[in-house]
Every structure is written in C-alpha cells, then in structure tokens.
Amino acid sequence: MTSYFPWLTIIVVLPIFAASSIFFLPHKGNKVFRWYTTCICLTELLLTTYVFCYHFQLDDQLIQLEEDLKCINIFDFHWRLGIDGLSIGPILLTGFITTLATLAAWPVTRNSRLFYLLMLVMYSGQIGLFSSRDLLLFFIMWELELIPVYLLLSMWGGKKRLYSATKFILYTAGGSVFLLIGVLGMGLYGSNEPTLDFERLANQSYPVALEIIFYFGFLIAYAVKSPIIPLHTWLPDTHGEAHYSTCMLLAGILLKMGAYGLIRINMELLPHAHSLFSPWLVIVGTIQIIYAASTSFGQRNLKKRIACSSVSHMGFIIIGIGSITDTGLNGAILQILSHGFIGAALFFLSGTSCDRIRFVYLDEMGGISLPMPKIFTMFSSFSMASLALPGMSGFVAELVVFLGIITSPKYLLMPKILITFVMAIGMILTPIYLLSMSRQMFYGYKLFNVPNSFFVDSGPRELFVSICIFLPVIGIGIYPDCVFSLSVDKIEGILSNYFHR
C-alpha cells in the first residue's frame, strides 16, 4: 500500500534534520540543548504513535505506508520505505527508549551540543533501518550507527574509553564488510538489471551453495551486532566504559538491530539456507545462555555483569528464530521488545547508582539500600523482570520461546528435551547472578564505614524515567497480546512463504 503523504520519510529525516539545526541554537548553557533534544525526541515519538494508530491496519500483513523514490539510476537504488507488523514494534521501542535516554543524559555537561547531536543522528539511523525496504538503504542505515556510537564512547566514556571504542569499531566495521558483500551479491545476482527491492528479492531463487554463502555473510554481520558468541567480546568492554545513556541505546536498540536483520533478511529472503542453519542457531543460542550467565559471575564491574546478562538473554531470541515456528518467532520478537526495556532500565539505574557512590566494582559496594531506597526498589523490580518473574514481560517472552522450541516439528524429541533442559539451567543461573549482584550492591554495611559519606536518592527525573520503562514491562507481562497482535499475521506470512516456497 503506497502512501500519498511521506509519513515515514518525515519520521526518518526529522531527527537528523533537527541534529543539523542544533548548531544554530544560542549557547546559553546546557539547558537549551537538553530541552531542544528532548522536545524533538518527544515530538518524533508522538508523530510515530499518531501515524501507526491512524494510518496502520493491524489485519493487513502487506507493507504499508510504502514510499518509493528512485535515487541512483545505474544501480537501481531507491529511497524505499515501508512498515509491517514486524517493524512497528522495534520502531516504537526506538522512539520510547531514545526519548528516555535523552532525559537520562541531562547530567552530561561537557560538549553537550555534540552529545545530543550524535544521539539524534543515531535516532534517524535506527528508525531508517527498521523501516527500510531497500537492501542498500538498509546497509546505509546500518552504517549510520557506527560513527555516532564510536564518538559517544570515545569522548564521554570511562578511563578505558579509547580501547573500548576502538574495539567496537573494529568488530562492527569488520561485520559490515560481510554485510556489504551480501548486499551487493544479492543485488547483482541473476539479472541484467540489478535489484535491491525486498519484494523482488523475496521471489528470487538462488543455488543452494550461493544462498548459504549469502546467509553466512549476513549472519556474521548480525552475530557481531546482536551479539552472538564468539563475536560478543566487544560488548562488556563497551558497556563498561560508555555513559549510561549510551548504554541504554546500545542495550535497548542497537543489539536488537542484528536480531531484526536475521528475521527480515536471512529468514525472509533466504529460507532454504535458514532451514539448514537453524539447528546451529538453536545450539549456539543454548550455549550462549549458559556461557554468558556463567561468565557473568566473574565480572566485578557492575555494568559489565549486566552486559553479560544481555548476551545471555539474546540467546533466547536466537533460539526463537531458529525454532521456525510461529510460537517461537513471536517469542523472539517479544523478547526483543522485553529485553529492550529491561536492559535499558538496568543500565540506567546502574549508571545513576555508580555516579552517586563513585564506585563501579561490586566488591567495593554494599549497604546502599537504606540511603537510596527508590533506586533499590526500582533496581530490584527490574532485576525480577530480567530473571523472568511471572507477571512481567521477561517471563512471557521466555515461556513462549520455550513453547516454540518444544512444539517445533523440525527437531526430534530427544534434541528438544536436551535443549529445553539446558535452557532451564540457564534460567536457574540468571537469578543467581542477578540476586548476587543486588546483594553486593544494596546489602551489608561497607559504605557506611566511609567517613562523611552521604548519598542522594533518585530524583524526580530519574524516577520518571524508571517508571516510564517499568509500565510497559508490567503491561506486556499482563497482556502480551498487545505485542502479538502486531506481528502474528506477518509471521504467519513469513512461515507460509518459508515452507511453501
């Protein structure tokens, strides 16, 4: 369905246009840049919500609000945008988390004009990726993330920020090489006229060997970004050094771009190769849950421990994608949204806590539950959500992924039993390291022995950010159909095309 008004173009271009306009603002302190960026993000979120509420039809699994503008004649490159039930959830998540991340970044005072400019550029790249319907445009939006994240890390990070930023750019740029090769290979294959249109590529058939090569190239790029072991080692270092508002964007949105690409391109455009790779995805996802949960115990740095838990939770998404069932795939999408909220909240609360107590290592913390009861309450609540407490979004997402792999007709009974058993062990390890982390932070009397120690509890701004994230976590946990209703028709379409192609 083609849109006569360029709603998606406005949504994609507005943040980057506002970012370029930030240079014309008068420099009258950081307050001007804070309010300007927050208002732009809030306007973008409200505009996105309006467009989806009044111009998007849930019962239509076809691409909606489609826009098509030819940009380069030689290579058939189009500014081609469109959304469906698969992309609407990540787009709303992006707007929600980015708006709250700008509020979380208010304590940033050094070169705040550039800081907020980079956040707005990231915003455009993320929205553009989730709404792109052209393979080269997808790659451009994918790359648009790299430079802002690198600068946010290298300029506003911790003591080892340059090492972490360099490691991040090397990993992600290396993965992007494989992504570019796959994009060019699929676009140029088998036709005198190259095509990068998702719709035409979905009907393209390839020799099995070539499809496997394309699939593997895309998989490497997504394995770096998601991340999937063993290409995950950049993540703990990056989260350990980044400012917590940057961590919110990384954990809430950036990691989900890889999982989205795995569904949108690998599963939708390369189904035969995905059928061959799916058992390996399930195996790697299962190992990832156990491995990341186990290594989390050895992390003394608070944010690095939460980063390892993010890697562990991404394993459920990989398993859901590899299950090749509508239940498992719905669970993977629900986990994408659920962990986007929970991961962003945990990094926000850990960052605000570390700013107050001036410690980042768990063995230096202790006894802050009494002087900071609000932070203690919110952090404990999100820890419960992360360990899949019933009534919260994490529980529903992991349960649906469990059901998806158990009911998958692709796997035999014994492998399914073994996989679910190992997943259950991972779910047992999760509360162990999360509750251990909470005990080291909030209980004991270590910090009370510090002379003249005084800690300020969460203020109105931080409490507002925490509650805003907590509400959808509870809402999805109580009524998950609000997410399933967006994606269920599209997933059925992907799987029907997948099996009958």
Swiss-Prot record:
<feature type="transmembrane region" description="Helical">
    <location>
        <begin position="243"/>
        <end position="263"/>
    </location>
</feature>
<keyword id="KW-0472">Membrane</keyword>
<dbReference type="InterPro" id="IPR003918">
    <property type="entry name" value="NADH_UbQ_OxRdtase"/>
</dbReference>
<dbReference type="GO" id="GO:0048039">
    <property type="term" value="F:ubiquinone binding"/>
</dbReference>
<keyword id="KW-0520">NAD</keyword>
<protein>
    <recommendedName>
        <fullName>NAD(P)H-quinone oxidoreductase chain 4, chloroplastic</fullName>
        <ecNumber>7.1.1.-</ecNumber>
    </recommendedName>
</protein>
<comment type="similarity">
    <text>Belongs to the complex I subunit 4 family.</text>
</comment>
<dbReference type="Pfam" id="PF00361">
    <property type="entry name" value="Proton_antipo_M"/>
</dbReference>
<feature type="transmembrane region" description="Helical">
    <location>
        <begin position="387"/>
        <end position="407"/>
    </location>
</feature>
<feature type="transmembrane region" description="Helical">
    <location>
        <begin position="464"/>
        <end position="484"/>
    </location>
</feature>
<dbReference type="GO" id="GO:0008137">
    <property type="term" value="F:NADH dehydrogenase (ubiquinone) activity"/>
</dbReference>
<keyword id="KW-1133">Transmembrane helix</keyword>
<feature type="transmembrane region" description="Helical">
    <location>
        <begin position="306"/>
        <end position="326"/>
    </location>
</feature>
<feature type="transmembrane region" description="Helical">
    <location>
        <begin position="417"/>
        <end position="437"/>
    </location>
</feature>
<dbReference type="GO" id="GO:0015990">
    <property type="term" value="P:electron transport coupled proton transport"/>
</dbReference>
<keyword id="KW-0934">Plastid</keyword>
<keyword id="KW-0618">Plastoquinone</keyword>
<dbReference type="GO" id="GO:0042773">
    <property type="term" value="P:ATP synthesis coupled electron transport"/>
</dbReference>
<dbReference type="InterPro" id="IPR001750">
    <property type="entry name" value="ND/Mrp_TM"/>
</dbReference>
<keyword id="KW-0874">Quinone</keyword>
<feature type="transmembrane region" description="Helical">
    <location>
        <begin position="5"/>
        <end position="25"/>
    </location>
</feature>
<feature type="transmembrane region" description="Helical">
    <location>
        <begin position="135"/>
        <end position="155"/>
    </location>
</feature>
<feature type="transmembrane region" description="Helical">
    <location>
        <begin position="168"/>
        <end position="188"/>
    </location>
</feature>
<feature type="transmembrane region" description="Helical">
    <location>
        <begin position="273"/>
        <end position="293"/>
    </location>
</feature>
<keyword id="KW-0150">Chloroplast</keyword>
<feature type="transmembrane region" description="Helical">
    <location>
        <begin position="38"/>
        <end position="58"/>
    </location>
</feature>
<dbReference type="GO" id="GO:0009535">
    <property type="term" value="C:chloroplast thylakoid membrane"/>
</dbReference>
<keyword id="KW-0793">Thylakoid</keyword>
<keyword id="KW-0812">Transmembrane</keyword>
<dbReference type="InterPro" id="IPR022997">
    <property type="entry name" value="NADH_Q_OxRdtase_chain4"/>
</dbReference>
<feature type="transmembrane region" description="Helical">
    <location>
        <begin position="88"/>
        <end position="108"/>
    </location>
</feature>
<feature type="transmembrane region" description="Helical">
    <location>
        <begin position="209"/>
        <end position="229"/>
    </location>
</feature>
<feature type="transmembrane region" description="Helical">
    <location>
        <begin position="331"/>
        <end position="351"/>
    </location>
</feature>
<keyword id="KW-0521">NADP</keyword>
<keyword id="KW-1278">Translocase</keyword>
<feature type="transmembrane region" description="Helical">
    <location>
        <begin position="114"/>
        <end position="131"/>
    </location>
</feature>
<dbReference type="InterPro" id="IPR010227">
    <property type="entry name" value="NADH_Q_OxRdtase_chainM/4"/>
</dbReference>
